[in-house]
Structure formats: C-alpha cells, structure tokens
C-alpha cells in the first residue's frame, strides 16, 4: 500500500529498494514517513474499533492493535536510543545491556521475543493517546541521534532495520484490516495483459545479497552462486478466469490434485467455514451467460466483483499448488522467481 506523503527525496525514493543504501538525510525523512503511515492506519482502526477498546479476536495471524502500535515504537527504541552498540551495526551483541526506556514497563509489554503471542490479549496496555506520545518521543530521540551518526553501513544499520521493521508492520495493519473486514482505501490491481510462456535458458545466478549491498537481513546473507537449469515460466500471475476453470472442474473436490497435507488443510477449512474456494470469496464460478469468470470477493469489508483478468488473491500455497497440478504446471523455485 503506497504511502500518501512524500514520494521522492533527493536521488532515492523512499519507496525504492535503494533504501537499503539510504544515507542519513533520506533515512530521517523515511522514518518520519513510515511513522506517519503507521498513524494514518491507526486512525482507520480508531474509527472502527475505538468503541470496543480495539478488541480483536485472538487468532494466530493477528496481534491486538494497541500491542502492534506499542511494539513498533519499542523496537526502534530498543535497537537505537537504548542500544549503546548501535554504531557496530550487525556486529553488535544483540544481548548487550540496554539503557532504560523512557516508558516504564515497555519491555514486559512489547518485547516479542519474551511475550508469547496469545498472552498479548491479556496485557494491561497503556491507552492509545499514551502510546502515541511514546511513539512521538522515541522517534524524536532516534532522529536526534541520527543527525550525529556517520554515513556508513554499520552506523546506519539499525536505523534501516527500524525503518523496514515499521514498514513490515504497516503490511500487518493492512492484512489485519482485511481479516477483520475493516474499511481501508487500498488500490485494486488492474487486469493483466495476456500471459505467454517465457523460456529462460540455463544459467548461474547469484542468490542472496553481498555485504556491499547496504542493509541486508540475516536470511539474505551470504550470497551464493547456484546453477539454474532451463525452465519455462508464465509472464503474468494466474488470473481469475484461469482459476475459475479449476474450481468449475471440481478442483476443490478432487483429492488427486492436492498434496496430502494440503488436502487435510482443505478438509479442516471446509469443516470450519465450508471452504470451496479462496479466502474471502463469496461466489465463484462460470457465469451462465457468456462463459466469463464470476467471482465475488470481500475486500476490506466490501463485496466486490473481480474481473476475469485480475490476478488471483488470497490463495494458500496448497491451493496454488493444486491449481498447478490441474494445469500441468508447477510453482517456481526461489531462484527461478
């Protein structure tokens, strides 16, 4: 979901992968932009959930909204203003003693390594206004430190980490809204152009990122050369008109199309909610007149009719794999993707 504030700063866009190498000045603006984005999303939750004290169901894919909010501020403070080894970047000792927080109790509330998921629903958290104040104060402290920070990868590592962490939780706010049926203004993907098979010749490919790439997560290192055999891949994602044919051909009733574990998953979903199609789909099939795809899917609390040329959304790996078996295809490996 695109942010609504500044889009281009200096030579690097704050929505660009080049943010991995962003310098101090760009990072400062990007951190403010990410926080504005968090608060904008929070505002939508306040409209929908403030009267019920932001209560949401305790399910594995969600966090309580107030916990989500406080955790973002806690994470940045923990790794930046409270971290005396922040200048060492990824060479810092993650277990090193931290300075005290400006807010008592935050480690017991918001440290995701120590607070089990389900227990987050039973915490007595501060109110939304107090948490907003905590986020403001910690951001200001972190930005003051950033002004005095050298422009090198080690010194900027945790500032970039805090930025990407907050962006990741921005995604969590969005998918939580979809799960709960809360209204958000998120652009729909348009119809795809025609898909054709693309033959990719055999090659060797560098998978992962080198240290010189700027910021990298630990699971992106080290880079390694891998042999990639020749393969064929479609140039566009699977669209609804293709997936509807799979459903119409009994794809959700034919065990032979499913991985054994996927079939067990499907039966559990069917017992739970009568699942016979992708998540959030209310109707799916071939239209009686014209033979076009007919898909009605809930998007952020609204029932919308999907166009046949739009990409399929909200399918699990099991469903995607079953479609591939039906279509005589397979899912791409990471290096192929």
Where are each of the predicted segments found?
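Acidic, carboxylate-rich catalytic segments that either coordinate divalent cations
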Residues: 8-15
């Amino acid at each position: 979901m695109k942010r609504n504030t500044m889009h281009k700063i200096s030579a690097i866009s704050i929505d660009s992968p080049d943010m991995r190498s962003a310098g101090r000045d760009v990072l400062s603006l990007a951190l403010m932009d990410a926080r504005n984005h968090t608060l904008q999303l929070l505002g939508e939750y306040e409209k929908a959930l403030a009267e019920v004290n932001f209560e949401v169901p305790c399910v594995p894919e969600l966090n309580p909204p107030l916990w989500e909010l406080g955790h973002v501020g806690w994470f940045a403070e923990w790794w930046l203003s409270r971290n005396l080894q922040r200048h060492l970047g990824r060479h810092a000792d993650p277990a090193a003693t931290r300075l005290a927080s400006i807010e008592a109790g935050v480690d017991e509330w918001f440290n995701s390594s120590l607070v089990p998921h389900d227990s987050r629903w039973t915490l007595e958290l501060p109110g939304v206004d107090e948490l907003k104040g905590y986020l403001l104060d910690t951001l200001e402290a972190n930005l003051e430190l950033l002004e005095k920070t050298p422009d090198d990868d080690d010194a900027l590592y945790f500032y970039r980490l805090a930025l990407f962490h907050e962006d990741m939780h921005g995604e969590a706010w969005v998918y939580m809204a979809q799960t709960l049926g809360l209204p958000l203004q998120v652009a729909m993907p348009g119809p795809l152009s025609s898909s054709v098979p693309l033959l990719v010749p055999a090659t060797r490919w560098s998978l992962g990122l080198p240290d010189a790439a700027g910021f990298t997560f630990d699971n992106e290192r080290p880079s390694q050369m891998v042999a990639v055999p020749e393969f064929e891949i479609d140039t566009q994602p699977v669209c609804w008109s293709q997936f509807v044919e799979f459903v119409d051909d009994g794809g959700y009733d034919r065990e032979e199309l499913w991985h054994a574990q996927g079939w067990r998953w499907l039966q559990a979903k069917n017992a739970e909610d009568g699942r016979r199609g992708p998540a959030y789909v209310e109707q799916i099939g071939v239209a009686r007149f014209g033979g076009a795809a007919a898909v009605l899917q809930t998007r952020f609390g609204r029932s919308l009719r999907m166009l046949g040329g739009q990409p399929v959304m909200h399918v699990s790996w099991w469903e995607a794999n079953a479609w591939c078996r039906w279509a005589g295809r397979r899912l791409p490996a990471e290096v192929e993707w």
